[in-house]
Amino acid sequence: MEQHTLLQREESPRSPAAPSLRRLGGSRHITHWDPEDLGAWEAGNKGIARRNLLWSVVTVHLGYSVWTLWPVLELLMPQDVYGFSTSDKFLLGTIATLFGAFLRMPYALASAIFGGRNWATFSAIVLLIPAIGTTVLLTHPGLPLWPYLVCAALTGLGGGNFASSMSNANAFYPHRLKGSALGIAGGVGNLGVPAIQLVGLLAIATVGERKPYLVCALYVVLVAIAVIGVSLFMNNVEQHRVQVNRLRPIVSAVLSTRDTWLLSLLYLGTFGSFIGFSFVFGQVLQTNFLACGQSPARATLHAVELAFVGPLLAAVARIYGGRLADRVGGSRLTLIVFVAMTLAAGLLISASTLEGRHVGQHRGATMVGYFVCFVALFVLSGLGNGSVYKMIPTIFEACSRSLDLSEAERRDWSRIISGVVIGFVAAFGALGGVGINMALRESYLSTGSGTDAFWIFMMCYAAAAVLTWKVYDRRTVTDMGMLQAALVRQPASTPAELIGPRTHRTDSPGAASRRNVAAPG
């Protein structure tokens, strides 16, 4: 079994050629980590990185499931029992998405401050609050809307998990594997959305649609298991932790960089579509099945049977999106994705318009059109999620080459800035889900269909395609000077001050290899 401590080689005072091993005990703390050292990576650090990635994925997977509890529960909450309209249910999804988005930036920073393992343990523990609270709430139908809104906001704690887990994965893996690692972390994490929808389907099949609290009860158990696993098997990397007094210049540098905002806009289009459609897809299907004349029970069953397909394919696509971006380039794949999403949104508008002009006719054809177009948007958004996240470390690694730093300091700078940008981009992107919820809610309230909202989505995808082409796809890297200028505008924001003093200075590649070896047990 792999030991959970880092073994460091130091020169023996009796023989310079004979290394001795120093154990760091059972504290789960690693004092030095260099994923770019190929020898150390193959000698054992790869196993440590994989183990940390595994448990990061577990926490983000369960976080997504808790975050997207309400799209499933809404389908299992008949209006005659709980008294909530379709508009009320859209509002629950909007609140959950909004709070999850706002928590992502502080979660990313907290991981850097407190350590990956420490924060992952805490963030898993707090998932028990919405899981238990929602279980209690659903066993007492007839309550007003506001306590449900509070519980929906608390499920946003699961949305914050993503940013900290992605920052952790970014820190443990070498640049050549970041696309794959981030794709796996994001993709398997995103599988938490279809997973809870399948749990909802299982609940309907076994106990009927009137016991939604059983879904929450299951996740209370799963989260408790995750807390134990994370605390036992994850690591803190001391050199990856950032002192609180250094956060201000880091955040200032990130927010004053044009690439941060442009990447956020691109992720707004990809991840915003994924999480937004995940929240509304089941509700849209249920509304259309009811309009076809199906009973509420059958409409609910059919909606739950189909709603998981889109998020499932999107999560799988994200994994392959990261790998494909490693091969063909993140910007090129992102451009292709947005062009295809524009076309898919146009087809969705056609299906919705056909339904509006021929009310009661062609229902079967329009339902097929709805489903196919939504699934296409899900798959494309998953690919785009992987490609945009590949762009982040690539862009800032390229920017670091224009800075007057040693090779080791340059890697530290790139990792710190990329980690914070990942958190900010994740938060900004999730706001796209809020926009999708609000746009569809208003569209259904005013016109009874989602056509107006679909027009907005198509224009946003087209604008994102143009942005990607003009800024990123037409050149190899971004304007290096812009980031450097942002860093040196104020003395407190110089690169050396951003990364701080290094705990271990490396005198040679051989020294790095000797210090950075983890031995398997």
Language-model regions, residue ranges each:
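Hydrophobic core of transmembrane alpha-helices in multi-pass small-molecule transporters
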Residues: 144-160, 359-385
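Cytoplasmic helix-loop-helix junction between adjacent transmembrane helices
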Residues: 149-188
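Extracytoplasmic gate region of multi-pass secondary transporters
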Residues: 70-75, 257-315, 382-385, 389-390, ...
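Glycine-rich segments within core transmembrane alpha-helices of 12-TM secondary carriers
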Residues: 159, 179-204, 422-436
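Extracytoplasmic
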Residues: 51-82, 277-282, 436
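C-terminal ends and interior cores of transmembrane alpha-helices
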Residues: 125-141, 339-363
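Conserved MFS/SLC helix-loop-helix module at the cytosolic interface between two early adjacent transmembrane helices
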Residues: 102-145
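Helix-loop-helix hairpin linking two adjacent transmembrane segments in secondary transporters
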Residues: 185-235
